[in-house]
UniProtKB/Swiss-Prot annotation:
Binds 1 FAD per subunit. It catalyses: 2 reduced [2Fe-2S]-[ferredoxin] + NADP(+) + H(+) = 2 oxidized [2Fe-2S]-[ferredoxin] + NADPH. Homodimer. Belongs to the ferredoxin--NADP reductase type 2 family. Keywords: FAD, Flavoprotein, NADP, Oxidoreductase. GO terms for molecular function: ferredoxin-NADP+ reductase activity; flavin adenine dinucleotide binding; NADP binding. This is Ferredoxin--NADP reductase.
Amino acid sequence: MHNTDVLIIGAGPVGLFAIFQAGMLGMKCHVIDAQEVIGGQCITLYPEKPIYDIPAYPKIAAADLIKQLELQAATFNPVYHLNQQAVELKKEGEFFEVKTSKDIVIKSKVIVIAAGAGSFGPNKPPLANIEEFENESVFYFINNRSKFTGKNIVIAGGGDSAVDWAISLSEIANKIYLVHRRDKFRAANESLRQLKDIAESGKIELVTGYQLDSLEGNNSELQSVIVRDLQNNTRKLNANILLPFFGLKQELGNLVNWDLDIKLHHIEVDPVYYQTNISGIYAIGDVAHYSGKLKLILTGFAEAASSLHHAYGKVFDGNALHFEYSTTKYTQ
């Protein structure tokens, strides 16, 4: 059995920053994550995707952000339990005991759930024989941007991922078709401005009012993507790559059995300290929900700070926390 002050579930960007915040307050951390490496979706799904809304970084690749967060957290020697899930929860007096899928037991006074989307996988389009092209011509995640150099690419979707990747890949691709069933995209205003400018240059063609219909090709090599509009008209897009970005399937695993207040795959928390309906268990980042919630990495960082300042009194038996700025608290 391991004993620690704080158990963090999830080693994505918000979980990593929570380690640092706990360390700044003198609290030791163990961390559980289902992936084989730390970083969450930033590493597993889009390590090369540029992120634009991290303070002091006009633009930073997801993998580089994780590298910096890992370095920052390493100061406080966290213990990682990777490639395993939090399975069982028990309360023993003032302590929680969590058992992992590898039968490791971790005892702590506080739990911080920073599980992001939980266990995740892509929402795949219902296209016949799409499996024949997967990992050769059809990709749901991008972990090596350079492989798309000079390609003709169909990107399907209307959210941030579709728009951001269309913008990013337009720098190296021969041609990009951005397919969306509506004529409006759901993305940041600055991204929409960039998309409009690139579309006007001809590097990206907006194919709106259409949905994916079928694929044509041989031996896992895609030759064209057929799209269909609401009037049943079809159009053939000559492309050798399809990138469908229709979001992720969220699975919270055994967390659903912990008597937490869960609605629509999100954990309800109070909007001040992000504590769940169970005292001593907090939820931060994308997995947490409250009125006015913004799903931003930046928001998760702030939630980590607030929740761990509140948790201090639970870890140290009601002792008052005297607030200090990091410049006086900690010097590298």
